[in-house]
Amino acid sequence: MAQQRLDKIIASTGRYSRREVKTLVREGRVLVDGRIAASAEDKCDPLTARISVNGEELFYREHTYVMLHKPAGVLSATEDGRGETVLDLLAPEYRKIGLFPVGRLDKDTEGLLLLTDDGALAHDLLAPKKHVDKVYFVRTDGALGDADCKAFVQGITLGDGLECLPAKLEILKSDAQSEALITIREGKFHQIKRMLASRGKPVVYLKRLSMGSLTLDEGLSKGEYRLLTAEEIKNLRESGQFAQGKAGADK
């Protein structure tokens, strides 16, 4: 990998700002391969150099990928004066490295939300032509039936004339209050709520379970998060690169 400035490498971990790194170097508290760093502007290979600050070894990541179990009541934004955002749920070191949510969940929607600083991956997952699967659990007022499933497969046209791509509705429970799994491959504003409202079945609860190959970790409580594994990152990249077709056509 190309060499980078020491202050940039350390700042990428989110632990210290570049200004703080300069101070730490001046105080002799930064070691590179066991030697005291002479300057914050020194360059080294971030993948092979052993860098420590105050005796703690730091590990370089080109990009960061965080799986969050988003709770209701939190905004899918990096900052918003109207209320708490998903970044407010993260530890301070994750708030300094440019993470942003990949797509948005409504304020009252729960479930899987990916946060990253990898713009290329985010584009692949969100680009309309990619049609990456997103699966949701939904609870509605009103009994869902076969006619609703067929309408989803055919592609619902909303009241404002907006045409939705074919989607999949899998009914889990049909009663006065129904439950279902919905698979869509686009992300229009309030899409699932509007699709079901057009069928006379208003949504009372909505939770995203997966996006592409990435499935919400059942071990994460609402508001908790963890870093993605190397395997999850690899599979997610493949989801964005190779997704194609229509949700109602191949399942």
Where are the regions a protein language model picked out?
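Basic, flexible Lys/Arg- and Gly-enriched helix-loop patches that mediate nucleic-acid binding at interfaces
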Residues: 1-251
